[in-house]
């Protein structure tokens, strides 16, 4: 292409900057045309930089380096502009090329400048003599690979440790001094304005202590700064922090690994962190104030598509709030690009696909518009033009008929972004129509609680709110107000605590009178528990609906309230209606849990993740239960399925970490008995399990015993997140005297009584087998277990002998659960649940040989119907006894939710049910 063809390039006709550059450098137009034929890759940038540096002699001088980098920048800028204006490059290509340009410039400049300095002072070395490298952390859009075409670059310089250089033409200097000199020279090479322009403006203000801090900092200094002074806005900034220097050398790899270990816990909290909502809201308001101040000073810059309402920054904030809140628990949020964050938020159900698409389209439109504004004069501007000619050119470059059409589209996007931003960040804390201090709640939760002389007035106020025992409620409020926990809260947490306390008291009149006092007292128990974790107070402040649900749970169930107080991270579950309402999908649940475990930081974190995942699903089941959307049977089904899923994933993760493992997957299975086996699990039920293995390896017994011990530890150890399950292994062959894990063939012989008479199953063990099933682990062993179970249960038995042994076992159970009260124990007393279960087990063991349908583990009520079908009881009796069992289970379930350890009721409440069950027992066993 010749100069006469330069006008054919869209970039030269649109960009005043490129037109001037092409006039000063005739070969530029030809280079732009050649490069614009295809996307400009990192390899192309490196190759072109080699050519340009070779023109300046070897080794290239600093001046030659500056010239080459500036020429490369002009060519890349032109190629990107040409492809973009021609509609051949999308936003990702434009920002990717500019990011590659910045990284290539930084890495090449650093290598050449470091070599010069090392010739003078020697290589930088750490305390043990190891070579050290300067790490350049790209922040902001550089870190996110989202660099715009006229952006400055935000950098932070870090190095591994203090030390001294080895000495060269001059004597040694400190490592800190060496890297400071290197950093200063790098900044000069990139940002100094020469006759050829500049490469990138460099902004170092994000480093520790900003302009007043040292130019470079060691990792030790950075870690101390994060720990002592790190602020919320710096967490936000470091989300996009990324090393943009080379990663191949040993020094660079060490630095990257250590930097990640320091930054990750600073940015991503282990627990859900809702406190960042207020922090980002405050930061956004500061930015808006600065934007308004600039607009006042420069009215022509007032319409800012980056900092204005509905602009780029609001999209970035809307995405990154998810990272700060959830990135500690969900590694999928630890990504830099804004659109990748939105994709993960949508995949996680935190925003709808419609919202993700709307924000994505707005972001891409705004970034494209931003680039059009910047191509014009290579200016770092985000302001819409006021000059009519500039407006017309801008609209035409984007394919709009006129500027009004462009503004119409822009306003549509900005309105959508603004609405989504406000939905997340609008300050809901002060939304009441009246001042809290003027309300009854404000008068109660106040300094008056510290004044004994105010008790009478406070009791009267509490009575106005409808409390049955206002004096007792006052005593609890005073205890909290005067406690060291409350007094020691940081100011921001105390303000939030007070707001939630006011709201809880204001809500009292709307709470069921029978539970009002207890509900509010439990709420303050919860507030005391979460007070030290400002994030949970922030959640309750930011989301009033969450507090309403908390009060609903606390009022409806004592057990559920205690569960929430023990596991306050479950507060987050109250925000997600979609997750609560979504169908239970256990394969998807396990896959998501596996991904989170794979990204976890060690075994302790994995154990916490398992507990959090289990607790969240238990709580979801509880919320559906309290809403009347699950029957007692369905609650038990879901809890049992959840336990199976947790066991399956835990078996996998524990095996993967077992040093002794001799195969990729264990030939090992967990077999469920009791409530888990019968799918009648309650919220706080133990898991009755046995462990089987089937592995010919000579080390198998030792390996699986070690594995089982480790598995039990993972399931039962109390971590900061609580325990996963209580496990009962006494139903294994020979009970507590037996082996922890049992070989499958040995289990078969034990159950079929083929071995030593002293080592065979008792009748009660065969009773237990009627409710047993495969739960988790190797499905092949599960199928083999079921075959053994069928063989055992279909073995012919003597009716009289079987009846006698079952009656004797029933007496032992009764003796083991004495009831000295006048209330009826729904499970263990005569006429209760155990009588029904033993009768069903008797029929299964006696008649399964003739009626194999009876061995199906379908639950006691379904088995009663099977028994009636075979003529062993009438349909009427089956319905009556089945209804009694269902009534007992509902009552037991309700009492457990109310926090009762033993499920006992007034005898007259279940008189008819007891009579029906007693009649059944007498008919079957004659006793």
UniProtKB/Swiss-Prot annotation:
HAMAP family hit by this protein: GlnE
InterPro entries documented for this protein: GlnE, GlnE_rpt_dom, NT_sf, PII_UdlTrfase/GS_AdlTrfase
Entries under Pfam families matching the protein: GlnD_UR_UTase, GlnE
Any one Gene Ontology cellular component term annotated for this protein: cytosol
Organism: Burkholderia pseudomallei (strain K96243)
Top-level taxon in the UniProt lineage: Bacteria
Cofactor: Mg(2+)
Region described as Adenylyl transferase: 438-927
Chemical reaction(s) catalysed: [glutamine synthetase]-O(4)-(5'-adenylyl)-L-tyrosine + phosphate = [glutamine synthetase]-L-tyrosine + ADP; [glutamine synthetase]-L-tyrosine + ATP = [glutamine synthetase]-O(4)-(5'-adenylyl)-L-tyrosine + diphosphate
GO biological process per UniProt: regulation of glutamine family amino acid metabolic process
Any one GO MF annotation of this record: ATP binding
Entry function: Involved in the regulation of glutamine synthetase GlnA, a key enzyme in the process to assimilate ammonia. When cellular nitrogen levels are high, the C-terminal adenylyl transferase (AT) inactivates GlnA by covalent transfer of an adenylyl group from ATP to specific tyrosine residue of GlnA, thus reducing its activity. Conversely, when nitrogen levels are low, the N-terminal adenylyl removase (AR) activates GlnA by removing the adenylyl group by phosphorolysis, increasing its activity.
Region feature Adenylyl removase, mapped onto this chain: 1-428
UniProt name for this protein: Bifunctional glutamine synthetase adenylyltransferase/adenylyl-removing enzyme
Key words of the record: ATP-binding, Magnesium, Multifunctional enzyme, Nucleotide-binding, Nucleotidyltransferase, Transferase
E.C. number: 2.7.7.89, 2.7.7.42
Family that this chain belongs to: Belongs to the GlnE family.
Taxonomic lineage from the root: Bacteria, Pseudomonadati, Pseudomonadota, Betaproteobacteria, Burkholderiales
Signal sequence residues: none
């Amino acid at each position: 292409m010749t100069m006469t063809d330069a006008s054919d390039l869209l970039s030269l006709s649109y960009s005043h900057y490129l037109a001037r550059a092409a006039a000063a450098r005739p070969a530029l137009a030809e280079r732009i045309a050649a490069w614009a034929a295809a996307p400009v890759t990192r390899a192309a940038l490196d190759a072109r930089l080699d050519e340009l540096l070779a023109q300046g002699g070897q080794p290239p001088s600093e001046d030659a380096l500056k010239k080459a980098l500036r020429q490369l920048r002009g060519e890349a800028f032109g190629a990107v502009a040409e492809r973009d204006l021609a509609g051949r490059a999308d936003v990702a290509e434009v920002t990717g090329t500019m990011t590659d340009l910045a990284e290539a410039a930084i890495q090449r400049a650093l290598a050449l400048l470091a070599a010069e300095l090392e010739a003078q002072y020697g290589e930088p070395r750490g305390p043990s003599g190891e070579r050290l490298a300067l790490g350049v952390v790209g922040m902001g859009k550089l870190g996110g690979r989202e660099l715009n075409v006229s952006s400055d670059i935000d950098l932070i310089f870090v190095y591994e440790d203090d030390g001294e250089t080895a000495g060269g033409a001059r004597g040694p200097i400190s490592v800190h001094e060496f890297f400071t000199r290197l950093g200063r020279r790098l900044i000069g090479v990139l940002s100094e304005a020469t006759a050829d322009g500049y490469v990138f403006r460099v902004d170092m203000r994000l480093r520790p202590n900003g302009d007043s801090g040292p130019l470079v900092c060691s990792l030790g200094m950075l870690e101390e700064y994060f720990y002592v002074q790190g602020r919320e806005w710096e967490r936000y900034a470091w989300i996009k922090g990324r090393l943009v220097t080379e990663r191949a050398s040993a020094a660079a790899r060490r630095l990257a690994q250590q930097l990640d270990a320091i930054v990750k816990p600073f940015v991503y909290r282990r627990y859900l962190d809702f406190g960042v909502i207020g922090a980002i809201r405050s930061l956004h308001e500061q930015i808006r104030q600065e934007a308004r101040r600039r607009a006042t000073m420069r009215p022509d810059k007032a319409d800012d598509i980056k900092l204005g309402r509905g602009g780029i920054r609001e999209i970035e904030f809307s995405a990154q709030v998810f990272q700060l809140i959830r990135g500690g628990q969900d590694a999928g949020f630890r990504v830099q690009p804004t659109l990748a964050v939105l994709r993960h938020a949508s995949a996680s159900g935190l925003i709808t696909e419609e919202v993700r698409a709307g924000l994505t389209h707005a972001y891409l439109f705004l970034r494209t518009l931003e680039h059009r504004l910047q191509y014009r004069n290579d200016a770092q501007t985000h302001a819409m033009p006021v000059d009519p000619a500039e407006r017309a050119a801008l609209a035409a470059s984007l394919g709009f008929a006129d500027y009004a059409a462009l503004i119409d589209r822009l306003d549509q996007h900005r309105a959508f972004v603004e609405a989504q931003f406000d939905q997340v960040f609008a300050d809901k804390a002060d939304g009441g129509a009246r001042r809290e201090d003027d309300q009854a709640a404000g008068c109660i939760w106040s300094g008056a609680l510290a004044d004994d002389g105010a008790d009478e007035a406070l009791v009267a106020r509490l009575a106005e709110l409808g409390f049955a025992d206002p004096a007792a409620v006052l005593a609890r409020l005073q205890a909290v107000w005067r406690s060291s926990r409350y007094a020691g809260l940081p100011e921001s947490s105390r303000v939030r605590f007070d707001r939630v306390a006011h709201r809880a008291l204001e809500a009292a009149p709307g709470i069921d009178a029978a539970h009002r006092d207890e509900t509010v007292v439990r709420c303050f128990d919860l507030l005391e528990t979460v007070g030290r974790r400002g994030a949970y107070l922030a959640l309750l402040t930011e989301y009033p609906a969450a507090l309403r649900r908390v009060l609903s749970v606390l009022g409806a169930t004592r057990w559920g309230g205690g569960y929430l107080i023990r596991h306050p991270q479950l507060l987050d579950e109250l925000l997600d209606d979609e997750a609560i309402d979504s169908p239970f999908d256990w394969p998807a649940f396990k896959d998501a849990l596996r991904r989170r475990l794979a990204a976890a930081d060690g075994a302790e974190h994995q154990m916490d993740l398992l507990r959090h995942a289990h607790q969240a699903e238990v709580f979801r089941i509880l919320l559906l239960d309290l809403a009347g959307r699950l029957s007692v049977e369905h609650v038990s089904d879901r809890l049992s399925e959840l336990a199976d899923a947790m066991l399956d994933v835990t078996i996998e993760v524990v095996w993967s970490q077992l040093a002794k493992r001799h195969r990729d997957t264990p030939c090992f299975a967990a077999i469920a008995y009791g409530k888990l086996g019968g799918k009648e699990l309650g919220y706080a039920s133990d898991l009755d399990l046995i462990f089987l293995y089937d592995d010919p390896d000579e080390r198998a017994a030792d390996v699986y015993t070690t594995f089982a011990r480790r598995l039990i530890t993972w399931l039962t150890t109390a971590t900061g997140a609580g325990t996963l399950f209580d496990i009962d292994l006494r139903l294994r062959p020979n009970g507590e005297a037996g082996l922890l894990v049992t070989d499958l063939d040995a289990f078969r012989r034990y159950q079929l009584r083929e071995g030593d008479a002293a080592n065979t199953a008792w009748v009660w063990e065969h009773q237990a087998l009627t409710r047993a099933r495969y739960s988790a682990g190797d499905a092949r062993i599960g199928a083999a277990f079921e075959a053994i179970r069928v063989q055992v249960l279909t073995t012919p038995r003597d009716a009289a002998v079987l009846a006698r042994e079952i009656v004797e076992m029933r007496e032992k159970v009764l003796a083991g659960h004495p009831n000295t009260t006048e209330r009826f124990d729904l499970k263990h007393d005569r006429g209760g649940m155990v009588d029904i279960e033993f009768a069903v087990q008797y029929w299964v063991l006696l008649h399964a040989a003739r009626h194999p349908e009876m061995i199906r583990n379908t639950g006691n009520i379904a088995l009663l119907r099977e028994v009636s079908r075979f003529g062993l009881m009438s349909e009427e009796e089956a319905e009556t006894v089945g209804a009694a069992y269902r009534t007992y289970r509902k009552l037991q379930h309700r009492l457990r939710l109310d926090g009762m350890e033993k499920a006992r009721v007034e005898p007259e409440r279940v008189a008819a049910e007891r009579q029906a069950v007693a009649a059944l027992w007498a008919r079957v066993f004659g006793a």
